[in-house]
UniProtKB/Swiss-Prot annotation:
This is NAD(P)H-quinone oxidoreductase subunit I, chloroplastic. It catalyses: a plastoquinone + NADH + (n+1) H(+)(in) = a plastoquinol + NAD(+) + n H(+)(out); a plastoquinone + NADPH + (n+1) H(+)(in) = a plastoquinol + NADP(+) + n H(+)(out). Belongs to the complex I 23 kDa subunit family. GO terms for biological process: photosynthesis, light reaction. [4Fe-4S] cluster 2 binds at C74, C104, C107, C110. The lineage of its organism: Eukaryota, Viridiplantae, Streptophyta, Embryophyta, Tracheophyta. Gene3D superfamilies: 3.30.70.3270. It comes from Barbarea verna (Land cress). Residues 55-84, 95-124 form the 4Fe-4S ferredoxin-type domain. NDH is composed of at least 16 different subunits, 5 of which are encoded in the nucleus.
Length: 167
């Protein structure tokens, strides 16, 4: 009789333990009902990017010294830098700079190691196109600021402010 009572006690303890585990899982599930949804409705809502987001690369032609550090640190040798040596001033003159975003892995090495800070990451992440050749950006396309920067409140205030002329 004693082994039978011990068996029922073990069965009861196992049942209570199982009910406790099920209750813990149920409480975790209920705690998720109070959270805000993470999903966004993409075409109608835009993703809020973090400060360190690595989007499209912005290029400033005037700052570039054609040192090709960006090409050397790129894991896939992506930036194409065309330059000409000016013998009279003994400096390189940048002719063309382009990046193909169809191949770019957005690692950020080019931005990090650029000695003149002519490269920077933007918040732009929408690159959809029907032709992959449209993803090859030259220095003119890389120099354009993304719309999120143009729509910034401070930029709009500066653009809309009346300019005073000192007479």
């Amino acid at each position: 009789m004693l082994p039978m009572i011990t068996g029922f006690m073990n069965y009861g303890q196992q049942t209570l333990r199982a009910a406790r585990y099920i209750g813990q899982g149920f409480m975790i599930t209920l705690s998720h009902t109070n959270r805000l949804p993470v999903t966004i409705q993409y075409p109608y809502e835009k993703l809020i990017t973090s400060e360190r987001f690595r989007g499209r690369i912005h290029f400033e032609f005037d700052k570039c010294i054609a040192c090709e550090v960006c090409v050397r640190v790129c894991p896939i040798d992506l930036p194409v830098v065309d330059w000409k040596l000016e013998t009279n001033i003994r400096k390189k003159r940048l002719l063309n700079y382009s990046i193909d975003f169809g191949i770019c892995i957005f690692c950020g090495n080019c931005v990090e190691y650029c000695p003149t800070n002519c490269l920077s990451m933007t918040e732009e992440y929408e690159f959809s196109t029907y032709d992959r050749h449209e993803l090859n950006y030259n220095q003119i396309a890389l120099g354009r600021l993304p719309m999120s920067v143009i729509d910034d409140y401070t930029i709009r205030t500066i653009l809309n402010s009346p300019q005073t002329i000192n007479g």
